[in-house]
Amino acid sequence: MATDVLPTQETHSAIPLGTRNGIEMAILRRTEKTLGKIISRPNSADLIDGVQIEPLQVYPDDRGFFTELARLGKGLAANMVPDDTRKIQMSLTLTYPGTIKAIHYHSEQTDLWAPVSGMVQVFLYDLRRHSRTFGAINTIFAGRFQPWEILIPPGVGHGYKALGVEPIQLVYLTDRHYNPADELRIAYNHPDIAYDWEIQHK
């Protein structure tokens, strides 16, 4: 696994993706595959600007366990309060082992992810040309053994790989209803992003 060195705009050209909703987006070219910065603490200084992580509290007993995923208007869901202009959507996705779902990005929508079964390798990439972390990559391992919820702002590319031998389930909130025009895509194996989806420790 290569140590991640953030390219500089002076020595690496950026591939423009256009401006949407006032956000100028681009891909900052890399030449070596990388996991970027692996995030091991919710308050890591290496987090992409605007990305937030909050550990979920698990309350086990002899019947099973209880976990509160979100309180609308509180915590990471502080801005996810429905009103006349904001329509909140909650979704559940199940993904088979080894499947990669990436790279998605939005110019308007904010996502709040909570993997509720299995483990996922979450990929995040800052596409925002004027962000202080433009071009940065984060890798986050979350799910059963690390119950975190992850807030992903507009302009941050995202995706995940289902780890292990069982399907994973991911619950996610979005701060607006599904809008096909804001569902933007980049190939999961885009050569200029150069994210390393392979198993690292064999």
How should these model regions be labeled?
Residues 2-145, 165-202:
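Non-catalytic, conserved peripheral segments adjacent to functional cores
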Residues 142-165:
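Conserved metal-binding segment of the jelly-roll/cupin
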